[in-house]
């Protein structure tokens, strides 16, 4: 689990900085509030050394995910094959932590290109959830899925299925998905 201290200080990065990441890629910092994707990018790069069959990351990465889906679902994007994506989507509906597959078209990666670095850390005004995933895609070379859990990470009111406050979103989802994958492997 990647973690870091996030506070102002003399070594804090600033808009306009170019940072060399774990992977060796350089990132132009346009928005210092997009710090979560910077940490996650290094973690995804670090994971390459283990040659994973699949990596699924979850993060409360963007407010635009909340704007897109409200508190009723979470965006799913990635490079994993469609069958695996469908399996996790099926699990998400089974446990009522619904995922919606968002596209990760090449045009979104184009939005992340920088004139002074390999990539920039934000893509601009449009498709913030997708461009965040497009940024992360630069740091993987294995099957990968990204879940932006921001829409369901915090419940402002209780419902029949979820308590108020921290939701524990994705715990049931991963349990169901992995249970099904283990059952599939045992057959």
List each language-model region with its residue ranges.
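A generic structural signal for tightly packed, nonpolar segments enriched in small/aliphatic residues
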Residues: 1-187
